């Protein structure tokens, strides 16, 4: 199978009736015949009688070229390339209609803020950011007007303690006190009956002690030592101790200097003098 047969089978054209290659079969002529054809201005192809000769049987799909009077060369063929090119042009022209939608898809985001959901005048930034504000104001993004929100009762905060991962160890490791409602209670009667223990939260206690020692030498030679102790409860204890410093009397002669060991006479005097003194 030739390359031309493979090409025609790929595009669905019927097979040839002969094994002659139409691309180059009609071009394998003598040089003299080519010159004669050029002089006569004829064309080589299906219109040429030599093309329909028994030596060159006609085929369903032919290929040829002709010389125009102006000196140009024009190729013509019956392989169906014109239809093929026309089909490709129609396909690529239709691709222009395969455009994206005119409106791009909108990404999910926060809804537009309405005037009723804006920060109300006089409301603190903390209340606007908290899910359950401390001042029991209605939620900003709830879509409820201020006049309607005033008549509603504040929603209690949910008990998130039971949903914590280590809520089973609260009795061993107490982390946060239990949530209590924010309301005014009369504590006078409760304190008079139960005392301050149940009312006040237990506070951790720490014990420490600070000790500072200061020594001062006065001009008369007395050394004063001041010791200050401060405990965790703020009690301060200061102890002052005075004693005289060790000093030699002023009228005493100069104390003898130790002999230098590098002097041989001094070493002999040291040993011999002691021996003679002991005698």
From Swiss-Prot:
Region annotated Involved in ATP2A2 binding, chain positions: 203-245
Region Mediates interaction with UCP3, residue ranges: 210-279
Renumbered residue ranges of the record's region Involved in HCLS1 binding: 114-279
Localisation per UniProt entry: Mitochondrion matrix; Endoplasmic reticulum; Nucleus membrane; Cytoplasmic vesicle
Chain spans, region Involved in CASP9 binding: 175-206
Organism superkingdom: Eukaryota
Stretch list, region Involved in GNA13 binding: 176-247
Residue segments, region Required for localization in mitochondria: 2-41
Molecular function (Gene Ontology), one example: protein domain specific binding
A single GO BP: regulation of autophagy of mitochondrion
PTM (free text): Proteolytically cleaved by caspase-3 during apoptosis.
Residues at the site labelled Cleavage: 127-128
Biased composition (Basic and acidic residues): 115-124, 167-184, 217-255
Membrane-protein topology: Peripheral membrane protein
InterPro entries (alphabetical): HAX-1
Predominant cellular place of this UniProt entry's protein: mitochondrion
Region span, Disordered: 16-65, 99-262
Disease: Neutropenia, severe congenital 3, autosomal recessive: A disorder of hematopoiesis characterized by maturation arrest of granulopoiesis at the level of promyelocytes with peripheral blood absolute neutrophil counts below 0.5 x 10(9)/l and early onset of severe bacterial infections. Some patients affected by severe congenital neutropenia type 3 have neurological manifestations such as psychomotor retardation and seizures.
Family: Belongs to the HAX1 family.
Quaternary organization: Interacts with ABCB1, ABCB4 and ABCB11. Directly associates with HCLS1/HS1, through binding to its N-terminal region. Interacts with CTTN. Interacts with PKD2. Interacts with GNA13. Interacts with CASP9. Interacts with ITGB6. Interacts with PLN and ATP2A2; these interactions are inhibited by calcium. Interacts with GRB7. Interacts (via C-terminus) with XIAP/BIRC4 (via BIR 2 domain and BIR 3 domain) and this interaction blocks ubiquitination of XIAP/BIRC4. Interacts with TPC2. Interacts with KCNC3. Interacts with XPO1. Interacts with RNF217.
Protein name: HCLS1-associated protein X-1
């Amino acid at each position: 199978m030739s390359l031309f047969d493979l090409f025609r089978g790929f595009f669905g054209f019927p097979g040839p009736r002969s094994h002659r290659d139409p691309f180059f079969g009609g071009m394998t002529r003598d040089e003299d015949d080519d010159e004669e054809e050029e002089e006569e201005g004829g064309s080589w192809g299906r219109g040429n009688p030599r093309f329909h000769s028994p030596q060159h049987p006609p085929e369903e799909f032919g290929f040829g070229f002709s010389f125009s009077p102006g000196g140009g060369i024009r190729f013509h063929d019956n392989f169906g390339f014109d239809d093929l090119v026309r089909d490709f042009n129609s396909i690529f022209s239709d691709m222009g209609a395969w455009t994206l939608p005119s409106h791009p898809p909108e990404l999910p985001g926060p809804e537009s803020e309405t005037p009723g959901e804006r920060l109300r005048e006089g409301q603190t930034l903390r209340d606007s950011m908290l899910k359950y504000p401390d001042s029991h104001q209605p939620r900003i993004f709830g879509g409820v007007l201020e006049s309607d929100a005033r008549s509603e009762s504040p929603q209690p905060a949910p008990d998130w303690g039971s949903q914590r991962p280590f809520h089973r160890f609260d009795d061993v490791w107490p982390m946060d006190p239990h949530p209590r409602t924010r309301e005014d209670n009369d504590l006078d009667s409760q304190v008079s009956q139960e005392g301050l223990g149940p009312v006040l939260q237990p506070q951790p206690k720490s014990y420490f002690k600070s000790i500072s020692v200061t020594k001062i030498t006065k001009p008369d030679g007395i050394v004063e030592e001041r010791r200050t102790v401060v405990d965790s409860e703020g009690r301060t204890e200061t102890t002052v101790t005075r004693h005289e410093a060790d000093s030699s009397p002023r009228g005493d002669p100069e104390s003898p200097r130790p002999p230098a060991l590098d002097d041989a006479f001094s070493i002999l005097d040291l040993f011999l003098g002691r021996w003679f003194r002991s005698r």
